[in-house]
Structure formats: C-alpha cells, structure tokens
C-alpha cells in the first residue's frame, strides 16, 4: 500500500498548488515553467460534492480514497470493484463514493481529466484511468504522459479543446485540491486505497474480508 503521513497532506497540497499544470495543447506539450500557477494566483478552493455510484438511498455507504497513480488502487478497481458493484451497488444495498488523493502532479492531472466530462461520466473515465494505468503511466517523459492522458480523454469522448479547458481551469484545480485536503484530513487517511464503510475506517484487504464488513453493516441496519 502506498503510504503517506497525515502531515504530508498539507505539504502535498502546497506543492500541487504551485506546480505547473499541463496546457496539453494538441502537440501534447505541457505549459512552460514560466506559466506555472503560484499559490497567490490560485483562487480560493471550495469542497466539491461527492459523486455517488449507486442509489442515493442505499443503506450502506462506502467511501474509497484512491490515487490514479497508485497500483494497488488500480488492482482494487480491476478485481474487487466489479464484485462490489454486482453484489451490492447494483442491488441497491450500497452506494459508493470515490474520493481522489493526489500524491503528485500527474495524479492531479488525471483527477482533473476524470472530472472533465461531468459527474455523469466520472466513473467511466475513472475506470479507463484505472484499468489503463500501466499503459498511460508507462512513459519516459511528462510529455509522453500528457499524450497518454489525452488518449484516455479522447477514448471517453472528450475533445482536445474540452480537455485543455479543464486542465487550465484554475478554479476547478483549486476546488479539487481543497476537496482532497478537507476529506483526507477529516478521515485521517494514511494510505491508498483506504475505505470508510458507514463511518468505519477500513484498510485495503481481500474481498472476502471486506465482504464481511459490508454484510455486518447491512445486518446492523435491520
């Protein structure tokens, strides 16, 4: 599991805020260093609403803290999320919320892309990023990663202009960072993937063990 100290949240947030965000023009060239956003230039961020997968009135809520650059997160999405969806989400027993964690600028770029198509497409884009993580992260340069992310966006039906607008939206970037910082601090997140199941913090674990926790929460609802 990819671990980070709680104190890292503040440091990571500061670093992300001043990092150069990719313009990702059609040539897939990131914005030059001189165009980097500074903390003073960034607007005040606000906490964005959660994007729910499943029925809003499902009795049990599962929150996952995940990073798009975390291999264990990708493994959960490839192996266990389909089981969770089939057995609990699609049957109305559980609603699922993914909250993005940003370890680095690349993870932030991917997080912006996931939100770029709107809330209705968030989980579809997230699935593309997680299932294709080894492919789009397998790059020698940031230019290559930029190009790979653009391919993911195009596969999700986004235009180059749409992606550029999202990556250059200072307010959205500030909001995503504020959302990450607020939730991760409140839930004392120490690594990814981490889960909060009806208020109980749960670490990444085999499916059979997670299933026991979910079933116990459902039984407690009566």
Residue ranges and their predicted role:
Residues 2-3, 9-104, 177, 181, ...:
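Extracytoplasmic thiol/disulfide redox context detector
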Residues 56, 89-91, 121, 187-190:
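Extracellular/periplasmic catalytic domains that process cell-envelope and extracellular macromolecules
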């Amino acid at each position: 599991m990819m671990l980070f100290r709680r104190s890292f949240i503040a440091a990571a947030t500061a670093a992300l805020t001043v990092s150069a965000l990719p313009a990702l023009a059609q040539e897939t060239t990131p914005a030059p260093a001189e165009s980097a956003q500074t903390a003073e230039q960034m607007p005040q961020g606000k906490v964005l609403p959660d994007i729910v997968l499943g029925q809003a009135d499902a009795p049990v809520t599962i929150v996952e803290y995940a990073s798009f650059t975390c291999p264990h997160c990708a493994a959960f999405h490839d192996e266990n999320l389909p089981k969770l969806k089939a057995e609990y989400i699609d049957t109305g027993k559980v609603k699922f919320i993914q909250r993005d964690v940003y370890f680095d600028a690349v993870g932030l770029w991917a997080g912006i892309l996931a939100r770029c198509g709107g809330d209705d497409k968030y989980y579809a884009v997230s699935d593309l990023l997680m299932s294709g993580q080894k492919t789009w992260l397998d790059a020698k340069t940031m230019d290559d990663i930029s190009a790979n992310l653009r391919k993911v966006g195009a596969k999700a039906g986004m235009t180059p202009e749409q992606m550029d607008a999202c990556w250059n939206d200072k307010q959205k970037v500030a909001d995503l960072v504020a959302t990450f910082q607020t939730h991760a601090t409140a839930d004392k997140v120490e690594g990814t993937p981490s889960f909060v199941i009806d208020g109980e913090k749960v670490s990444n674990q085999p499916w059979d063990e997670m299933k026991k926790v979910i079933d116990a929460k459902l039984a407690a609802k009566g």
